[in-house]
């Protein structure tokens, strides 16, 4: 619809902070609509110390049964995806898709560098979830970016979208 298109366009035209805030908003809405309550079931933007004494601030920490915690970090690459999805010319579309995949790879490197598994005060699972809030973008990664999924898995990162979150 027109309102949704205008909201999406304003987010795309905004900076990476606006896009990140939007991704976190989508993630939080999914958690709440699944019946999870903050701060009992999950926490957002909480600062933790890692084993080296450095501050770490994952987007979301979901508290699981058995005193285990699941870290979810929202990574939004809306600009590159929007350009790909809204281009008709196949040559330019291919160029934008490569740019989109490159931005996903950069997000993976950033998440790997954050090294959330080293957070001291929580018992993280072996894998971090990298949340991509745009379902068609996730599907495109699954269909065309198999090397990205394998790269993520090697880094102990699972890429997820709204429909693949585990609740």
Residue ranges of each PLM-predicted region?
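Amphipathic, heptad-repeat alpha-helical coiled-coil/stalk segments that mediate oligomerization
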Residues: 1-167
């Amino acid at each position: 619809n027109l309102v949704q298109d205008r909201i999406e366009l304003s987010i795309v035209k905004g900076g990476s902070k606006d896009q990140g805030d939007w991704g976190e908003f989508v993630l939080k809405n999914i958690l709440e609509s699944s019946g999870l309550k903050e701060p009992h079931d999950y926490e957002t933007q909480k600062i933790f110390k890692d084993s080296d004494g450095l501050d770490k601030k994952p987007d979301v920490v979901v508290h699981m049964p058995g005193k285990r915690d699941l870290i979810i970090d929202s990574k939004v690459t809306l600009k590159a995806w929007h350009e790909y999805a809204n281009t008709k010319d196949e040559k330019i579309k291919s160029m934008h898709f490569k740019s989109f995949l490159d931005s996903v790879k950069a997000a993976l490197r950033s998440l790997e560098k954050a090294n959330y598994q080293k957070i001291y005060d929580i018992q993280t699972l072996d894998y971090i979830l990298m949340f991509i809030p745009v379902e068609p973008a996730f599907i495109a990664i699954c269909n065309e970016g198999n090397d990205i999924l394998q790269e993520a898995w090697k880094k102990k990162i699972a890429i997820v979208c709204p429909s693949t979150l585990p609740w």
